[in-house]
Design a protein with these regions (language model features):
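Glycoside hydrolase catalytic-domain context in secreted enzymes
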Residues: 1-256
């Protein structure tokens, strides 16, 4: 985990073991062991000098050996290129060297162009061909399970009718998820001098951003309501002031 704006060069150093195991890893462990996810993605940044996609401690020792993950590990897009591209991590000099580092650490699949050099790396003795075959097997198993090689009429994913799009059940579920994801803080002893029936202050850069409500890897909803819009619609008699307060990726605070 690191700052969004410099994730391609960021190096997380001296992370306390307790913080790693109690703060960062529990969610991933639960997804692997309880949720049985089929695929895990390694991120851009470095941890103690090693990019996540060439970090055997996390990909092999923790993810596979300790947690028992059997699925596919893929890189974030362009992450392996960051190993050797000028001005980035600088852990490799060439795409071939970067590819060898990633494959040997346990990254099965790359989103990018570096893995085109796998044959060259194998011929140079930088990668054992057995590792390539192992990764290929994991990739093919995942695609077989998805039905990529089957006829459309035999694949359940192609049989989903269009009328489920934006259906009531899905909208109700989305609303429930949104409601349960909200954390409410009480204004005890009028710490903030606000009368909830007269004046409401909505703060935060995401309060008036419909894209961030769903994330940047999602479909397009038929309609959406931002937090700010929802509060204004509900509290029509109150003065609702919006203060972005800060930005998501820049180290600055806006005037309120």
């Amino acid at each position: 985990s690191g700052p969004e704006w410099n994730r391609h060069v960021f190096n997380l150093e001296n992370l306390p073991a307790r913080d790693l195991w109690e703060t960062y890893l529990p969610a991933f462990k639960s997804l692997v062991q309880d949720g049985h996810v089929a695929e895990v993605m390694c991120a851009y940044q470095r941890i103690d000098g090693a990019p996540c996609c060439s970090n055997a401690k996390f990909e092999r020792q923790i993810l596979r050996d300790e947690w028992g993950f059997k699925g596919l590990i893929t890189s974030d897009c362009g992450a392996v290129n960051d190993f050797y591209m000028p001005g980035y991590h600088g852990t490799a000099k060439t795409a071939t060297e970067a590819t060898a580092q990633a494959v040997n650490a346990g990254t099965d699949l790359e989103c990018g162009s570096a893995y085109r050099t796998i044959p060259k790396a194998v011929k140079a003795g930088m990668i054992n061909e057995d590792k390539v075959n192992q990764s290929l097997k994991r990739l093919l198993v995942a695609r077989f399970k998805l039905g990529d090689f089957d006829k459309d009429e035999t694949v359940s994913w192609t049989q989903i009718p269009e009328n489920v799009i934006a259906c009531k059940a899905h909208k109700d579920l989305a609303e429930k998820i949104a409601e349960e994801g909200i954390v409410l803080l009480q204004n005890r002893n009028q710490l903030l001098p606000l009368n909830r029936n007269q004046k409401i202050v909505v703060m935060g850069p995401n309060a008036n951003d419909s894209i961030m409500l769903r994330g940047n890897y999602s479909g397009y909803p038929t309609s959406s309501t931002t937090i700010l819009q929802g509060i204004r619609n509900y509290m029509k008699g109150a003065e609702v002031k919006y203060v972005p307060a800060c930005t998501l990726t820049r180290n600055e605070v806006q005037e309120s």
